[in-house]
Amino acid sequence: GIFFEDINYGADGGLYAELIQNRDFEYTPTDRGNDQNWNSTHSWSVQGSDATLSIATENPIHPNNPHYAVFDVNAAEQTALMNAGFDGIALKKGEKYDFSLFGKVLEGKGGKVLVNLVDKDETIIGQTAVNVTSKDWKQQKAVLTATSDAVAASLSIVPQAVSKYALDMISLFPQKTFKGRKNGLRADLAQTLADLHPRFVRFPGGCVAHGDGIDNIYDWKGSIGPLEARKPLRNLWGYHQTRGLGYHEDMGAEPVPVLAAGVPCQNSGTCAHHSKDELTCMGQQGGVPMEEMDQYIQDVLDLIEYANGDARKTVWGKKRGEAGHPKPFNLKFIGIGNEDMITPVFVERFKMIFDAVKAKHPEVTVIGTTGPFYEGTDYEVGWDLATELGVPMVDEHYYVEPGWMIHNQEYYDHYDRSKAKVYLGEYAAHLPGRPNNVETALAEALYLTAVERNGDVVEMTSYAPLLAKDGHTQWNPDLIYFNNTEVRPTVGYYTQQMYG
């Protein structure tokens, strides 16, 4: 299978085909270590001197999306609001692009707004228009056709009337997405993943799932519903998640969603809503407060209902149907926890979640966690906990030298067959400098023969990380590297493809 996490710009600017960066004006310095340039106007600029751009929060489209742009235009046809996309906007001659925005008029009457695709030499290579005249939020849609190829184009919004405009959710999507889906995946990148023939997809993390601090734990409910109502989230890898890429399918693989076990990453350093002092801003932060655990557990159960519930008879099944998927996903697995330190705080909350899922949904296999290494305290205590509770499967992670994989062919030969099954959820061979080369790929291939031989114990495997965008990597090696116009599978990719 494959493991997808939004690291290395894997989602926004990557697999998610949206071409506009900071479309929701929700970037904030806290996304990026208090970088003051990473703010609500990041990636946006004003061309011309007769207009100003500011950010407002009064009467937004939705409380989950509180910031929007105020474009105050004092000279018609002479100023533009520009967006440079993610390292530029790549366009293909003759292809169509879906444009949309939410807009309203704050002062004046508004009017026609030109929407241009502009190459880096300032040549207009695509144009359409929308009308922004309403005093209330209203979505406008149009289609642009690129008249030439471009590697680093920009989007230009040019009001034709003097007015003060409120704008939000400014979006540009290629019509040629993977399988032609609206709000879909970048076609070439998604096809490269599909060519691995994954039997399952683990998502959304990884570290993203349990987050940097309790308030950064991945809230799956914020990733579904209309795009303008989704709740953006700070990415602990140092950037922003629009969460346009939500909980749905596109490759026919089994879903393996991962939820936090009521605790954030043990390396957290961001204060939670209940933190009382600097000490309680660190580590697992005491876990989700016990008075909030009932609701947290209900959120876990609601995810299963969203995936499997009857679209006519259940609350969350109905929401899935409203999203365009009345047929259940037939969810079989759910991960609880990720590489966690097995502390009393973790154990108490994991037990509560595990017992609730087992009682309500015995048909769903809960996957526990045994820490980030193939040995050590968390590995041993995690296995002891799984054995005590009867957890049906555990998630093992390890990043090791090629030599370890070569000399540990018997690693799973001696596992107790009466205990939990294993999901090797994250692994890779690491060399100094972190290349993905023939040596690492051969070591991984050799090790997978031993894993396959022990298929009665190790039921699932996935390499990590999966994707990395040039110039935006937080981790190496990765399986697939890409930029706006190219996708470059590594040698290790072909190892995974052979086993797929």
Predicted regions mapped to residue ranges:
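Extracellular and organelle-lumenal recognition/adhesion modules and their flexible linkers in secreted
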Residues: 1-242, 273-283, 290-291, 361, ...
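The substrate-binding groove and active-site-proximal loops of carbohydrate-active enzymes
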Residues: 87, 171-183, 229-244, 261, ...
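Acidic-and-aromatic substrate-binding clefts and catalytic sites of carbohydrate-active enzymes
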Residues: 108, 133, 264-265, 311-315, ...
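An active-site-proximal structural segment forming one wall of the substrate-binding cleft
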Residues: 144-156, 162, 175-199, 203, ...
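Solvent-exposed loop/turn segments at secondary-structure junctions
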Residues: 8-9, 206-210, 261-265, 338-342, ...
